[in-house]
């Protein structure tokens, strides 16, 4: 009788352990999924993988005679009624030369909207050598109805691009931006990325 009574208790403990293991697995997978995006972003920023550009705080001390053609692409994801485009479609700086270009963004909706620009460089091998000193993509951007901003990007191409086997034959790179809608409170941070107000339509 004692053995029969102990069997259900043992089975209950085993079932409890199985449930605990399953819950631990589910929570563990959830935590890994949550961490995967920021970890992947950090990996791309460090390695330049997938055309992710580098953020730097100082300019290049070496400027080569060779030039690099840089073209620009601007896109807006669904959810933002913005007109977003580069002021110049392409530039031809010397490799290592620090240069500033500008994009404009105009809110064509009747409400304040917030956006975050996501960027990449093609071909992907050039991403690690594309260094940004200043960029509106470093912060979120708020635009009031009818408001238009002029947003600078300061960058240079690392001279090491001509020495690397995978990138030495690259002569044209494309810097591409896509603005995505961003939810949240509306701080006074529109100009933190260097944006300048151009006009406000009443």
Curated annotation (Swiss-Prot):
Disulfide bond positions: none
Periplasmic topological domain: 37-202
Membrane-spanning residues: 14-36
Topology relative to the membrane: Single-pass type II membrane protein
Subcellular location: Cell inner membrane
GO CC terms in record: plasma membrane
Residue spans, topological domain Cytoplasmic: 1-13
One GO BP: respiratory chain complex IV assembly
UniProt-listed PANTHER family: CYTOCHROME C OXIDASE ASSEMBLY PROTEIN COX11, MITOCHONDRIAL-RELATED, CYTOCHROME C OXIDASE ASSEMBLY PROTEIN COX11-RELATED
Annotated function: Exerts its effect at some terminal stage of cytochrome c oxidase synthesis, probably by being involved in the insertion of the copper B into subunit I.
Protein name: Cytochrome c oxidase assembly protein CtaG
Species of provenance: Rhizobium etli (strain CIAT 652)
Taxonomic placement: Bacteria, Pseudomonadati, Pseudomonadota, Alphaproteobacteria, Hyphomicrobiales
Gene: ctaG
């Amino acid at each position: 009788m004692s053995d029969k009574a102990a069997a259900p208790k043992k089975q209950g403990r085993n079932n409890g352990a199985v449930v605990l293991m399953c819950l631990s697995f589910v929570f563990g997978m959830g935590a890994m999924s949550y961490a995967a995006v920021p970890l992947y972003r950090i990996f791309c920023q460090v390695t330049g993988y997938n055309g992710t550009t580098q953020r730097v705080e100082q300019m290049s001390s070496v400027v080569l005679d060779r030039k690099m053609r840089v073209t620009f692409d601007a896109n807006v994801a669904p959810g933002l009624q913005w007109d977003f485009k580069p002021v110049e479609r392409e530039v031809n700086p010397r490799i290592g030369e620090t240069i500033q270009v500008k994009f404009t963004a105009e809110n064509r909706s009747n409400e304040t909207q917030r956006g975050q620009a996501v960027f990449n460089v093609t071909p992907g091998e050039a991403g690690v050598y594309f260094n940004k000193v200043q960029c509106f993509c470093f912060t979120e951007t708020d635009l009031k109805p009818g408001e238009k901003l002029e947003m600078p990007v300061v960058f240079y191409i690392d001279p090491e691009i001509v020495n690397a086997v995978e990138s030495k034959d690259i002569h044209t790179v494309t810097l591409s931006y896509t603005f995505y809608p961003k939810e949240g409170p509306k701080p006074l941070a529109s100009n933190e990325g260097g944006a300048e107000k151009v006009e406000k339509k009443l």
